[in-house]
Amino acid sequence: MNKRLRDAVKKGNLFIPFITAGDPVREATIALALSLQRSGADVLELGIPYSDPLADGPVIQNASKRALAGGMTLAKAMALVPEMRKEGLTIPVIVFTYANPLLQFGFERFCETACDYGIDGLLVPDLPFEESETLANECEKQGLALISLVAPTSQQRIKAIASRAQGFLYCVSSLGVTGARKTLHPQVEAFLKLVKEASPVPFVVGFGISSYEQVEEMGRHADGVVIGSAIVEQIGLRCEALKQAESRDEAVKEIEQYVNSLLHPAPTY
């Protein structure tokens, strides 16, 4: 794991937004990444669009469709990161990709390219923990963190996954696919307590956070939150405006205001 990611996760109270690369166009992705940094993002999770995204709900599936329709690929998505860096992005970037595009690209080639491009880590939701060793070794060679996902399961399995965790541990906060949920799963608190006891690294909660109240609640039990579907939905609502250079800035500003509303309580007058 490199210094940039190590320093970022040390701070605690992490805000990790997710966006899909190329949704709806590459220029919008760069502008949104910089906007999320302005809002206080500690780490950016950059999703690689995929035609069969099993772990994603309809909002992120639609984002993938939009990005793929625009010609986005794994290679092109990775190449956005040095452009973001050139524009002033300083926070760590974690790439979220399914195993199939990664296998086609090649583990070694991916890790070398990611390192060259200023990418800090990788998250592969459909790669079983038991089959992750080869990729973990390639990541280690290049100083990339292979982020582990952990779901409510046996204490023994949580301990096994946590013992090899790098960077931070990504906890699934509600059962099933991702998506903005109104309520959190009732067993989440007990699950997070188990993770806290087992994890040597900070742990964050994702999959379903969509309000300031949920962010605050999760902050009491975890070291941070991942917010994906709620942000991606706002991008989808402004898809046409984000495609056009003349309307993009205003659309990005509106999304930034929405993100700020998730992180700060509404003012009381």
Curated annotation (Swiss-Prot):
Molecular function GO terms recorded: tryptophan synthase activity
Q: Give the InterPro entries listed for this entry.
A: Aldolase_TIM, RibuloseP-bd_barrel, Trp_synthase_alpha_AS, Trp_synthase_suA
Q: Which PROSITE patterns match?
A: TRP_SYNTHASE_ALPHA
Pfam families per record = Trp_syntA
Its pathway is: Amino-acid biosynthesis; L-tryptophan biosynthesis; L-tryptophan from chorismate: step 5/5
Q: What is its EC number?
A: 4.2.1.20
Recorded family membership: Belongs to the TrpA family.
Q: Summarize subunit and interaction data from the UniProt record for this chain.
A: Tetramer of two alpha and two beta chains.
| Name listed for the protein in its UniProt record | Tryptophan synthase alpha chain
